[in-house]
Amino acid sequence: MENLCQRLNACQEKILDYYELDSDKLSDQIDYWKLVRYECAIFYKAREGNMQCINHQVVPSTTVCKEKAWQAIELHIALQSLMNSEYGKEKWTMRDTCYELYVTEPKHCFKKEGTTVTVVFDCNKENTMDYIRWTSVYYKTDMGWCKTNGEVDYKGIYYMHGCCKQYYVDFKQEALKYGTGLQWDVHVCGQVICCPEFVSSTSGDQISTAQTAEPLSNNTTQTPETTCVPRCTEETPAPETAKRRRLSGPNTPVTTTSVTRPRSSLEHTDNVLHSNSGSNNPGRGTCSDQTVFIVHLKGDTNCLKCLRYRFKKHKGLYCKVSSTWHWTSNTNQGIVTITFDSETQRASFLTTVKIPQSITSTLGIMSL
């Protein structure tokens, strides 16, 4: 018994030395786990001799001694093989080589530099879970150790095992566990990955001409006369009178005078839209002088639809939001228009609502 006490004292003294050393060399971590194996063997031998205490320490049960010894042996052998690979010269701390991290998903792999991945289930900010994506993953093959990067997509968190994706977190299973399993959003490194199961259409879908923006539902149809931009003073011709009477209504007096038509153009500078809110043209009598502040969101159609759905949680921060639309050109990008009562409300919206980096926002002013 005295011999076992002396051996245990010497072993634990060296273990404490490695704790204080806080080395980042793999060789030191291998020596540390060799001492842990030795400590487990001493405790197992003491239990076989029916010893309940040794050096004022309670001797674990035989089952516990075996389990800890197997863990130490497994990790010690894995570190020795890693030492013989090209990654043996990298920095390895005691935290990087602990057994708890070794058996954390992905299991039986060494991992470094974890980043947090937050998943929001069912668009409920109160129903979130955090997961770890490892920047570096070291896994063992028949040819030796390999190093790869951890990745994340809408399905889960994975690493590339050869040419195959090895998922170690399945967001679908997590969504069934913590929510309805129908929808979830992945937030990682300032980006948002939307669940494609919620977005039914694809980016190639054609937008129907019947899909019009809510804020523009009451606007009158523009004629070619209102879209042209003459730059000179001209005499209003007689045929123009009947056309203007139809636009202005039967009771509106008609005058044939020399008028200067203002330039009504939409200028785009530094992602800010400016337009003239007033007009002296009598032919535009049906246009309202109401001016609203707007934000155009431009990007992938599916992302815009999912983003627009999340706007329901922030109804007090905007006035109206349009459906997804696009210009009549060969482009897959869609546009969503949001209107605001004031510039302050718009600023509050942009501060509160997270806009993904894949979506570009353009500020502007529009007359209704």
Curated annotation (Swiss-Prot):
UniProt keyword annotations, A-Z: Activator, DNA replication, DNA-binding, Early protein, Host nucleus, Isopeptide bond, Phosphoprotein, Repressor, Transcription, Transcription regulation, Ubl conjugation
Claim: Transcription regulation is one of the keywords in the record: yes
One example of a Gene Ontology biological process annotation: viral DNA genome replication
Subcellular location: Host nucleus
Gene Ontology CC: one annotated term: host cell nucleus
Segments for region (DNA-binding domain): 291-368
Post-translational modification: Phosphorylated. Sumoylation plays a regulatory role in E2 transcriptional activity.
Protein name stated in the entry: Regulatory protein E2
Gene name linked to the record: E2
